[in-house]
């Protein structure tokens, strides 16, 4: 066997008849499979042991030669070679076809490769191949033309006219094979290239397509005639198995039926030809054979598919590769693995961040070989077999050994669907009783897990290297930050938030208010003995608290609460004392207003300070981010565990409960409702009088009810009591939001009808009062629509992620610095007055391309090619800089990847990105994972606000990445210049905008309802939109350059995600958008050997041009092409990756003709062939490490004799 990790590349081609015979171990002559009495394979049949190898290891068919001793010997009696039964998965057979047969992939594919090679239409080909017409192969002296089609009648007439043998015309694939053999590729290519110089239009397109196919055959060394089969390969029998079911019946793979049809028809044809049967019978048999082979290769490609029992189409060879259940996606890209298990998850509140609970029963099975080895080593079992029996009996000493084996051996936990890389993390197992896996509560957010019956899979890394990687790179305690935005992904939720919120609350006048303590210990004693409450405001000596005070805060008394003293006791030393939820308090120091001198009256001080709001969920997230920034992972995960324990403990003590009486009643609700009813009546009257249109009436009515609901909500917020448990849950961010609260206490408001339109009748009741039957019925529409939308959205979002991963999977950090001199100018992204993404967020963690100077003083804030930290970014913003030129993925010159400087920091670690990081896959996951949070709907405004429906949410993201023509397209100007005039035309309800440039003037017609983006006299650059809407990126690319398009797409994706409250780092979108513009279409090939119209990678194009210029030749010219992600995935250089994505047969047909070579640069192609992926620690530069010193001639080291001392 070839060592899979050694070979460099993989090539695919068309098999010649000689090659097929060389692969084969014998000819299959009979359609028989297995003898039903003896259960042995029939001779010369589809399962023959002589051809395909023995059914039992090291044993021939008759049983004469048994055992490894006879390895590779051939039995004289039965003729079977003694070898392993596994050879039945490798040895092929063949069928000698009685007539040539066309291969359906090359004849039927689009475009038909056979048709292009012969310059015949696919219809003509079909008529010839399926025996409907003759084709003239050699007209000799007659007035016929070569490749002319003749019907049966015309053929006979020509024979009568010209005499027998005066010309050669044939039918069937045989005729096509003769024609293909006649083609002189070099001559044809030369003629076509000459013709190409003069022709234009459709003819030019056709010539280029023919040239493409012919030169592909010439370069790859495939012969044209190989597209017609004379020999048919038979795949190994274990790949098309036949198994006996209970009750003596057999289940067989469809391929066996298909092969049987081919063999039957082939044998019948041979017999007919031997008998010299009439021509018409032989022709019919040949046609049937052609159809049988077509069905075997690709059932259903031509005509109706052949069906088996129950009208199910049979699965042909092509179907074995295609789709989700095909060979590529089912068996090569995703395999089932050993050393794994799955179980329901339960919460493990006592675990540390890096631990998970594994049930003993599960662990004993997972770690079985390790336990067995240890039992033998400790001499608790004589040999491995005895150890195995011991483990299966579950003897008492097995459990002790298990404890030692499990220690420090990390396991991987995975929850499906794995939407991003945090869906698989490593934990140290802790053995537990029960049958559920215990999961740390803070790991839930990364997995999107809850404990309502979710299941998780557990996997065991086996090798030392795998264990080391799991521990160092995948341990859950290391994954504090989310790769998509660099914010903490482990934020406390629910009970933890509630506990800490309750702990940091303040109340005036609680017992013991104004007491002053010397140390935190005294505070705790006082609280335990009931002198003070958690919420009591007290004083404490600053010097007893180990915190960084400012000079004038030392030796003073800090005014705080009992709970905050406890809360601050778990925060790492060196952090300020947190007394109020503000950023200043978190990053610099506690506010001076909370300090008093030793002699002051504390009651007076307390009277002058308002109560401070408690710490909510968002603030806890900020604290974690700050702790991480200062102390990195280890300290942060320790702090998180303390925070979790404190939160659970305090919420248990607080014992917050919810009863129906906790839902407040708004006193004047009926007044608000009555006012709304009256307003609706007025609007209806106006409509009846014809003062307003139906659309306006509808919008006004829904607006009234929206206002009514909002005023109720406002009343609720104004009157809310912060000690009310429901309000506490909502306010702290533990559970629920204002919308849930107003449905409980205010009114449910307007509902959506099944078609998505808002119904005019609102639900006036709330859940506390209870809904009427009619209201209940109304509200079910919206609820059902919500459920279906979610289900559809999940599928859509998953498919988007799959396409994104496919297009970017080979983008890896390949080098430290590409040395580019280009950069990207960035500023705030904003729509009108609304800020989408501020400059600050875009700067952090990127490298500068030009120095940034202070706009007023001119001093340098940061130099060229330097990493921008948070502090420097803040300085840049404070200096009032509006634009910065940074290194960007868009302008990176690294082929097949990105360099460290153009990418910036790795958001998941906060440090510089490592060479080998698979940034493409991370980018795809970061964009795909929040896809489910985006909305599905295209917003239909009531026909008033704007004329076009603007696509938003998930459909908009797909529209951008697939480079489709957007809905609600904006017209853009093609010239740079001044807006000369905007003229309205009342008759056609349009406006004409004239833009005058330096050289030419253009006019654009827009509708009256379109919202203008320009004014008369305004100076605009080409590519600027004239009206509101989405720009079509392909049009923008024609008008401007690739970088403008990339910048526009980046902004559009950010707008879509940020409008839904999802933050994604720019660099992820940059990686994806760059992949859409990787290709160049050759316009003029210069002196380079490529055809005009060819698509090429930018890096290859530049390299070829460089070579041409150095040799003093004409370089080629090309223009950048914007491709949607699906198209870009299929145009990748790797045929394995493309074939496993979509359109498998088309990709493979094309690759075979071109004799394509896959250099295995990306991740997918390496997974498919089972090679270690070239990313991370599998990167070439980490795998092939050269030793620094040559130690071959080093002096010998003498062995030192040692003795063991037994104690």
Swiss-Prot record:
**Gene encoding it?**
rpoC
Binding of Zn(2+) 2, residues: 818, 892, 899, 902
The reaction(s) catalysed by this protein are: RNA(n) + a ribonucleoside 5'-triphosphate = RNA(n+1) + diphosphate
Instruction: List the HAMAP family hit by this protein, alphabetically.
Output: RNApol_bact_RpoC
What is the taxonomic lineage of the source species?
Bacteria, Bacillati, Bacillota, Bacilli, Lactobacillales
The record, for CDD domains, names:
RNAP_beta'_C, RNAP_beta'_N
Q: What GO cellular-component annotations does this UniProt entry give?
A: DNA-directed RNA polymerase complex
Q: How is the cofactor bound?
A: Binds 1 Mg(2+) ion per subunit. Binds 2 Zn(2+) ions per subunit.
UniProt: Zn(2+) 1 binding residues:
60, 62, 75, 78
Q: What is this protein called?
A: DNA-directed RNA polymerase subunit beta'
- Identify the EC number(s): 2.7.7.6
By its UniProt entry, which Pfam families does this protein fall under?
A: RNA_pol_Rpb1_1, RNA_pol_Rpb1_2, RNA_pol_Rpb1_3, RNA_pol_Rpb1_4, RNA_pol_Rpb1_5
GO MF term list: DNA binding; DNA-directed RNA polymerase activity; magnesium ion binding; zinc ion binding
